[in-house]
A protein has these predicted regions:
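Nucleotide-activated sugar donor-binding and catalytic core shared by glycosyltransferases
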Residues: 1-275
Length: 275
């Protein structure tokens, strides 16, 4: 078993502590992603000898793209070669309005700034397009780009499946959604970092708290709780190009440092089968 337990889930487990303690103690070994999850299970009576922290296997499956392939992604998305790009990925209702307002204000200062906006649920794309139009911001839907040329847009609405990961590869930095409004929980904060990109996220990242804390500590992540904080963080990174270049190398080291969970879990399974 490999897993993580958020504070929200832990509160539920504690209500029925005796039941979950008995349930989890049936497992031979519980491989947890972080100490917080291990300590949570121990607090409801799970035997510590059955608990082992091995890290997050997501670090072992992160994609990579060569510079040549990244250039092709940029061309495919019709993003101008000299544009600065930020991505707001896996956004939820209530987040797009804030992000678009921040982008519109920053566009006045940074004329070559492009936002790629990727709602988490594709069925929200039509609603998101209406929000963009209501704000008078020039945009194009990714699904409409197949037969269009040119770079005349401020926002690219990513309304297609399976492209967000490679889009992260061509941005300067990213905001990861489901973190700015309640109940939140956060989505995968590590995906942009795999491409050397620092990340912004809101205060509601319970599902990824351990990774969020590690990113903040390393300087690769910034938590923003208000629209003003988001704008200030984006403006800072747009203005500090040398810092972004430094963070790119740091991000790759961060990922390498956290890899190996899958191998550790495989070794544990192998030992159990032999024993």
């Amino acid at each position: 078993f490999n897993g993580r337990i958020s504070s929200r889930s832990m509160r539920k487990y504690k209500i029925f502590g005796a039941f979950f303690s008995q349930l989890f103690n049936w497992f031979t070994m519980l491989c947890m992603q972080n100490p917080h999850s291990r300590n949570g299970l121990e607090s409801i009576g799970v035997d510590r000898s059955r608990l082992m922290v091995i890290g997050d296997p997501k670090f072992d499956t992160l994609p990579t793209l060569t510079k040549e392939k990244q250039d092709k992604v940029r061309q495919k998305l019709r993003i101008a070669p000299l544009s600065m790009v930020w991505v707001a990925g896996s956004t939820h209702e209530g987040e797009e309005e804030v992000i678009l307002d921040v982008h519109a204000r920053l566009k006045e200062q940074f004329g070559n700034l492009t936002l790629v906006l990727a709602p988490r649920r594709l069925e929200r794309s039509f609603h998101t397009a209406r929000i963009i139009m209501s704000k008078g911001i020039s945009f194009v839907r990714r699904s409409d780009q197949w037969d269009k040329d040119g770079y005349d847009f401020s926002v690219l609405l990513l309304d297609t499946m399976g492209e967000l990961a490679e889009v992260y590869s061509i941005c300067d930095f990213a905001f990861v959604g489901n973190s700015f409004v309640t109940p939140g929980g956060g989505h995968n904060l590590i995906e942009p970092v795999a491409y050397g990109k620092p990340v912004l996220f809101g205060p509601y990242v319970e599902n990824n708290q351990h990774n969020a804390d590690a990113l903040i500590e390393s300087g690769l992540g910034i938590k923003v709780s208000t629209a003003d904080e988001l704008e200030a963080a984006v403006r800072h990174w747009l203005s500090e190009r040398t810092e972004l270049a430094r963070l790119e190398g740091k991000a790759k080291g961060f990922v390498l440092h956290h890899q190996g969970a899958s191998r550790r879990m495989a070794d544990i399974i192998d030992d159990q089968l032999k024993g």
